[in-house]
């Protein structure tokens, strides 16, 4: 609660991504928000999607919905600082989305929107290097690994 009060009364207005990072730490922007940021999906999500290690939750603040999704500790990697906010790299955002589809927590139909983005060598290498065996098998339905 104190973090929220400090954030809302900061002298310099911060971006929505910074707000999402600040309210629950550690967290990084990923999934639909990062995919939209990188131009991989056309639509801009109405919520800000973040990855955390703790319990998944949604927070509504200043007419924004912040969605925090829990991921395994070993997958809490692959993010960089962009404009003062921690964000998944393009490859990691794709990985995260596929992981949450695999877990049944995201719709599979959006994969068709970004299937061309999955074909690059850098993306394939990231998926091969970071996915466990069962996740690789699932990803193999959409990407030639």
Question: Where are the regions that the model predicts?
Answer:
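Short beta-edge/loop segments at beta->alpha junctions of small alpha/beta modules
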Residues: 1-26, 62
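Short amphipathic alpha-helical segments, especially helix-boundary/capping motifs
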Residues: 6-12, 31, 68-73, 98-101
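Short, charged/polar surface micro-motifs in flexible loops or helix N-caps
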Residues: 11-15, 25-28, 40-41, 72-75
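A general structural signal for well-ordered alpha-helical packing
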Residues: 17, 31-32
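Short helix-capping and hinge/turn segments at secondary-structure transitions, especially at repeat
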Residues: 25, 36-43, 99, 103
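Short, well-structured alpha-helical patches and their helix-loop capping segments
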Residues: 26, 60, 86-90
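Exposed, interaction-prone assembly regions rather than primary DNA-binding/catalytic cores
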Residues: 32-83
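Hydrophobic alpha-helical interaction segments
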Residues: 79-145
